[in-house]
Amino acid sequence: MVREEVAGSTQTLQWKCVESRVDSKRLYYGRFILSPLRKGQADTVGIALRRALLGEIEGTCIARAKFGSVPHEYSTIAGIEESVQEILLNLKEIVLRSNLYGVRDASICVKGPRYITAQDIILPPSVEIVDTAQPIANLTEPIDFCIDLQIKRDRGYQTELRKNYQDGSYPIDAVSMPVRNVNYSIFSCGNGNEKHEILFLEIWTNGSLTPKEALYEASRNLIDLFLPFLHAEEEGTSFEENKNRFTPPLFTFKKRLTNLKKNKKGIPLNCIFIDQLELTSRTYNCLKRANIHTLLDLLSKTEEDLMRIDSFRMEDRKHIWDTLEKHLPIDLLKNKLSF
């Protein structure tokens, strides 16, 4: 456990982690402070962060299980202590850590008698189990037991109809919530006109993310949410009173991408795969899920098409432009490639 003394500041807005501990493999705790804040700001930040932490953080979970020759979820299987419903509930509690996108397959295939734990799940390389000792079932007889699983990344709590499908699979109410709980408290400091507030934020996670990682992701999601309001230029808004104030240039992705499309003559865009563009794994996975495999596929998409891709964010959009700007004028034109 790490502890630090809280040092109040009346100058620059700062945050720090004042306490961090691991209570168990599936319970991490972190305590953070943000100060100095003007009166009312701590409540604004605290409410926004709490909602973002509980509802906007993505998590990986088991979403479906397929048993062989099981008529319904309340059935019992000979040689297994638990019913199918109990096994599904145990699978629901398995905590996974991964950056995967889309649906992945996993499985369990063991021979009894023995206890089945999370360690027995055969996972794709990109997924790992936080607590391998989590129980799944107890085989009391020498039987072969196999389950096919589906793993997906999502956010929030997804409830599905409790029915078995024709292929014998059962949906699991997916809990894609790495953050278990969030509390915040506000303390006032100073006297008179120098009075300010300190925000204390407590975060508990399930071990798939640390509280610090969760806080970072929630903050990024909030920033992405408010970015459209910064595009005053696109709305034709002018602020005369701010003309002498430095403002970072707005990201005009659509205009730049249009210019690239106009100048793509002589470049074999269908022969250039996005694997060659040095994209981040997050951006690359988003494009792959949308069946964008080549530079021609990418330049054929509008800005609106890209923003409709699941989990695609504005920072991904900027990263794509920076990468295209880096590669197209230098690498491709220099080599004089043509269709």
UniProtKB/Swiss-Prot annotation:
Localization terms from the record: Plastid, Chloroplast
Q: Which GO terms describe its biological process?
A: DNA-templated transcription
What domain of life does the UniProt record list for this protein's source? Eukaryota
- Where does this chain mainly localize? plastid
Q: What is its EC number?
A: 2.7.7.6
- Transmembrane regions: none
The catalysed reaction is:
RNA(n) + a ribonucleoside 5'-triphosphate = RNA(n+1) + diphosphate
Instruction: Mention any one GO cellular component term assigned to this protein in its UniProt record.
Output: DNA-directed RNA polymerase complex
What would be one Pfam family of this protein?
A: RNA_pol_L
On whether Transferase is a keyword of this UniProt record, the answer is: yes
Chain positions covered by the region annotation Alpha N-terminal domain (alpha-NTD): 1-233
**Region Alpha C-terminal domain (alpha-CTD), annotated ranges:** 264-339
Listed InterPro entries: DNA-dir_RNA_pol_insert, DNA-dir_RNA_pol_RpoA/D/Rpb3, DNA-dir_RpoA, RBP11-like, RNAP_asu_C, RNApol_insert_sf
- Per the record, the coiled-coil ranges are none
In alphabetical order, the GO MF annotations are: DNA binding; DNA-directed RNA polymerase activity; protein dimerization activity
Q: Keyword annotations for this protein?
A: Chloroplast, DNA-directed RNA polymerase, Nucleotidyltransferase, Plastid, Transcription, Transferase
Biological role stated in the UniProt entry: DNA-dependent RNA polymerase catalyzes the transcription of DNA into RNA using the four ribonucleoside triphosphates as substrates.
Quaternary structure per UniProt?
Answer: In plastids the minimal PEP RNA polymerase catalytic core is composed of four subunits: alpha, beta, beta', and beta''. When a (nuclear-encoded) sigma factor is associated with the core the holoenzyme is formed, which can initiate transcription.
**What's written under domain?**
The N-terminal domain is essential for RNAP assembly and basal transcription, whereas the C-terminal domain is involved in interaction with transcriptional regulators and with upstream promoter elements.
Similarity remark: Belongs to the RNA polymerase alpha chain family.
- Name the record gives this protein: DNA-directed RNA polymerase subunit alpha
Record the organism.
Bromus inermis (Smooth brome grass)
Name the lineage.
Eukaryota, Viridiplantae, Streptophyta, Embryophyta, Tracheophyta
Q: Which gene produces this protein? A: rpoA
